Amino acid sequence: MRILANKTRLPHPRRREAPGSPPLSPRGHCPPAPAKPMHPENKLTNHGKTGNGGAQSQHQNVNQGPTCNLGSKGVGAGSHGAKANQISPSNSSLKNPQAGVSPFSSLKGKVKRERSVSVDSGEQREAGTPSLDSEAKEVAPRSKRRCVLERKQPYSGDEWCSGPDSEEDDKPIAAAHNCNVADPAMVTPQLGPGQTAQLPLSESSAPGPQHGPQPGLRPDVPGGGGGGVPGKPPSQFVYVFTTHLANTAAEAVLQGRAESILAYHQQNVPRAKLDQAPKVPPTPEPLPLNTPSAGTPQSQPPPLPPPPPAPGSAPPALPPEGPPEDTSQDLAPNSVGAASTGGGTGGTHPNTPTAATANNPLPPGGDPGSAPGSALLGEATPTGNGQRNLVGSEGLSKEQLEHRERSLQTLRDIERLLLRSGETEPFLKGPPGGAGEGGPPAQAPSAAQPPPSAPPGGLKKYEEPLQSMISQTQSLGGPPLEHEVPGHPQGGDMGQQMNMMMQRLGQDSLTPEQVAWRKLQEEYYEEKRRKEEQIGLHGGRPLQDMVGMGGMMGRGPPPPYHSKPGDQWPPGMGAQLRGPMDVQDPMQLRPGPPFPGPRFPGNQMQRVPGFGGMQSMPMEVPMNAMQRPVRPGMAWNEDLPPIGGPSNFAQNAVPYPGGQGEAERFMTPRVREELLRHQLLEKRSMGMQRPLGMAGSGMGQSMEMERMIQAHRQMDPAMFPGQMTGGDGLAGTPMGIEFGGGRGLLSPPMGQSGLREVDPPMGPGNLNMNMNVNMNMNMNLNVQMTPQQQMLMSQKMRGPGDMMGPQGLSPEEMARVRAQNSSGMMGGPQKMLMPSQFPNQGQQGFSGGQGPYQAMPQDMGNTPDMFSPDQSSVPMGTVGTARLSHMPLPPASNPPGSVHLASNRGLGRRPSDLTISINQMGSPGMGHLKSPTLSQVHSPLVTSPSANLKSPQTPSQMVPLPSANPPGPLKSPQVLSSSLGVRSPTGSPSRLKSPSMAVPSPGWVASPKTAMPSPGVSQNKQPPLSINSSSTLGNVEQGALPPSAPRNSSSAPPANPSSGLMNPSLPFTSSPDPTPSQNPLSLMMSQMSKYAMPSSTPLYHNAIKTIATSDDELLPDRPLLPPPPPPQGSGPGISNNQPNQMHMNPAAAQSPMGMNLPGQQPLSHEPPPTMLPSPTPLGSNIPLHPNAQGTGGSSQNSMMMAPGGPDSLNAPCGPVPSSSQMMSFPPRLQQPHGAMAPTGAGGPGLQQHYPSGMALPPEDLPTQPPGPIPPQQHLMGKGMTGRMGDAYPPGVLPGVASVLNDPELSEVIRPTPTGIPEFDLSRIIPSEKPSSTLQYFPKSENQPPKAQPPNLHLMNLQNMMAEQTPSRPPNLPGQQGVQRGLSMSMCHPGQMSLLGRTGVPPQQGMVPHGLHQGVMSPPQGLMTQQNFMLMKQRGVGGEVYTQPPHMLSPQGSLMGPPPQQNLMVSHPLRQRSVSLDSQMGYLPTPGSMANLPF
């Protein structure tokens, strides 16, 4: 609206500016030239700090250019239109990948379009403002010349034109960079548009205050026309002109009423200004003037004070928040007083001032917030939202206001998509970091300054200046992390404050009605928050985080703006929503009402409130728990179990039930948010909600959400999602569910990311998509899917409309399914994804809900896809990511649920998918149902395969995903990552790392999460054998998924995996810890990877892989290594956990499914063991497995390996045909089962996969080959029993079978008499992602060598292991198989993975799955590696590879397991590459599997 109006007008002026500086000479700063330089630099900055400040940079740059425009990035984009936007698009490309290409692209496209339209239209529109135009043209020439001339000057940085450009260019690197740092992670780019839009709005209010300063500045820069010769003063004075102001000034100048725009502005304070001016001008003027004197960041901090006045109005509303307001002002002011704060915060550095200058140049000032606001994003965004409304309402004509409102809504949508994830992240980050931190986070360094200097309030808010920096770093690394940290602390607080401030600020400019509305909203939010808090879904923070992380991603934007919650939640909502600051509320809103609002009209709105809270809470909880996705997973799982117990989300259950609307909405909203996040991330990131997400999933979980994710989110989702979160939510599978579910579903973050994250949130999107598609899954898919997947999902959702059908169920329905699946949980959603719910519920729900899931399966294919990329992880989960994510979240966004979702969801989802797949694949649909629960469980894997099968779908989606993945390997990693979302967030890395971890995370996390929940939930769930299977799996998956969620967190997942692995119980803690540690790098890499990955993937991915491997893998390795022992001890613990689960599972599910699944699930849990075993893949796994074996291990192994295990391993290759088939199947199936389950379980699958395929299975198999095999066979048999012999090839794995059966795969993989599927490389490679595959293949080659040495190492380990356990030998055989496999190729080096792949086709199936995973992205790499190895070993490499591509798809789709497996494989390889231990440790899950297997 205003933004648009501004945008439109500005673009107009800007456009004119392009020709000539518009009267808005301050805007003049935006001359194309500066903009361009800015953009180029921006590009540079952005590219350079894609992860970093790309977002901010872009925003700032874009904003700068656009700043002129409206200071709305979007506007800028519009203004810059093609130019900025294109550059922005580049940034966007980078960023979009980060921010969620879809959303941003969407944003970009939308914004660009709108802006272009605004620009063009705007010009025409503005034509209505001919005087402005004329003036703009008149002034433009002057200003422009001035700017240009000044710009020609060495970028005084003072000049509006030049300053922002140069300074912003420079500063953007610094400030923008900083901001960007926060932003990119935050998806500020998108935030930018929204934020910018908001900022303009903010600026509207800010303009008043800032106008004071601006006038001062203008005097300083009068000659410069904002040229701001006193470069610093302009820097110091950030004149934020609303479009209205700028236009008015221009008009006045044209009319001769004013000498200059500056004079006019100085003389005339807009209403907002007057509202604020009294508050601001006094301070602002003096301050700004002083500031000029201060002329330094101090000066800008003073501007901050003006912004406080700007918020001044807000202060009254927000007096307590006065400091917060100051902070808000720091935050908002960055946003609102963007000029000031922008100047202050932004101007903290002269560069920031440049930002401020840019802001100045952005007379609309909307941009300043955007520029600093980028950082402000969180701040500005919230503020922006409020201010946006504020501004939006401020001086525009009714028409413009309406337009602006629409634009705002659009922006808000985008914001929510992008910003939601970005915003929340920024919010979490920036706001958490501090408002200044928001910007400052970007400018952490500067933020440090501004916070100190500017921070009267800023500091207060910035209690976290360091955090700001951290935020920045994390922002960089993984916003999910940051925002979680800051977000949590400040998220709620600040969020509220910010929100309130925003609202209040917004109120400044807002009309009384709006103010009233806002107030109501605030009250509503607060009430909701209280409710939520009461709901205790776990503090809104997690939601915030989740939302922030995943939620961010999966903000409610889609619903809100789609549904018009925006209308309902007008700016307030936007603001509030947008203010992830008030993440809880806003977030809630955003996720909840907004989310639900539109998405679940009314209902959700209503519910969301509760669920908003719930959503928020859960999300937050997960965030909390997910705090790292891991914990959230646990938290949720724990909580869930407690809460949901069986339902897994009591709340959810209740809510879900209550609302399955709610829960599901909850979930959905959350998931959606996560998704969004993933989308954003990826992503996250995925198009989070298909609608928005899909569309908006520009973000995309990421974690590209994710993890935009990715991530964040990181999930997710970070984002699982965390993500994905990103995490996060993802990680908190519960949250994860959000993230995991959302991101997780998306956690991504994980998202995947996370939200998958982002596959870009494909994961999340995937999840989202899934969640959307399945609503559950679709949502997740969407979240995970984000852009690609979003698209895919869209297609799939739409295309697989059937999925959509089922998935299309409605988001609600899907969500419901998801909810049911999630049964309990959001986590459920994640978990829903979780086989648990998913399988169980999912299976039932999805199985029954298979509709949904059938769709899911198909969708799952998507989901896998979605997950695959993002939610591959998420699912990885199906929601493979997150953030992480998201769900994305890798399992986080990975499966954002992604991760968790992915895993959870992925698992669940995927299992669902798988189940469906399997069901579909069907082998015994019912059996599958039940078994498929297993199947589903492995289904996830299988699903992956199935999904793979779905592959048709998946392939289609997946392929796209893969395609995305091919690019996607790059992207896929991203997507995968994103998809992993969570994984994505760690996406690539996560995917690599997190995915590895994440997937493993899911496994591990599953272990942890599930492990804990597993036992609890698992037991909980397990009791329901079905559910057990499913549930257990779900649990495991949940665990896995939650891990995914962690995966969403990506980093966390990896850590989590370690942790998870490390402590099934501890997982969360450990994971979280590792996650955090991992997160920064992991997330950062993930996010970077996620964002940058597409192009960088190979290099970056490899680097990430390396880093991930080194870092995460090693890291997990360490944890894992310790865990291994623990797994041995703990393994038992884990094993217990897992075994527990395993036992539970095994016991409950011991039967083929329960046990297998559970076994797998336990495996999943055990994957921690397995994972641990990873580290101790042999040892832990063995012992663990033995434990598991004896206990659940048997089952587990049995399940895992049993089918593939001893048999396969034993007769790794012998049985491969039959037992191995089964085994293979188990490996594969198991992989599908174990793998799938693992995959589904994410880690579990992976682990299971690994165990299944590897030690565990062997061991288990040996121990329980009969039982397990039967069970597994049962499981497998379910999928594989029949298939065992022949079925094996076909039923080799449900997943593999699916894969084999997969229409696409069928061509590629053809059952052989031996039961070893042969992969027709010619088909496959060309098939899904030849390049990706190839790429990875080479990667693989690189790693394979590495891998092989590690492999050798592994072999040694395995040998040791083999020697260790006679029983193990089989297991080892798996491992031994590796050895043997290696030696005996047939055995499946990674029984599943490599060898399995190589040795055992089933394993290949698995491997494909694994490869798939590997193939997916990192997985792919691994896959490739595996394949490579396989190829080498088996010569199946190609085939395997082939399958992997296929499987990849599916497996990618497979998410965790695949990713895990892939990761496992990839990681294994990678990890192997990195280190056996690492691989074992990190990859162990994936690596473990592959590793061990290898």
Curated annotation (Swiss-Prot):
Biased amino acid composition, Low complexity: 348-360, 1046-1059
- Protein's UniProt keywords contain Ubl conjugation: yes
Q: Which Pfam families match?
A: BCL9
Please give the Gene Ontology molecular function terms for this protein. Answer: beta-catenin binding; transcription coactivator activity
Q: Which domain of life is it from?
A: Eukaryota
Q: Where is this region: Necessary for interaction with CTNNB1?
A: 302-530
Check the record and name the InterPro entries matching this protein.
Answer: Bcl-9/Bcl-9l, BCL9_beta-catenin-bd_dom, Znf_RING/FYVE/PHD
What's any GO biological process attached to this entry? myoblast differentiation
Q: Where in the cell is it found?
A: Nucleus
Might you report a single GO cellular component term?
nucleoplasm
Q: Which residues carry this modification: N6-acetyllysine?
A: K36, K108, K110, K137
Which portions of the chain have biased composition (kind: Polar residues)? 45-70, 85-96, 193-207, 932-957, 974-993, 1016-1035, 1060-1082, 1133-1143
Query: Its function?
Result: Transcriptional regulator that acts as an activator. Promotes beta-catenin transcriptional activity. Plays a role in tumorigenesis. Enhances the neoplastic transforming activity of CTNNB1.
UniProt comment concerning the protein's domains: Tne C-terminal domain is important for its transactivation activity.
What does the annotation say about its assembly with partners?
Found in a complex with CDC73; CTNNB1 and PYGO1. Interacts with CTNNB1.
Which family is annotated? Belongs to the BCL9 family.
For this protein, the record's PANTHER family field holds: B-CELL CLL_LYMPHOMA 9-LIKE PROTEIN (PTHR15185:SF3), BCL9 (PTHR15185)
Q: What's this protein's name? A: B-cell CLL/lymphoma 9-like protein
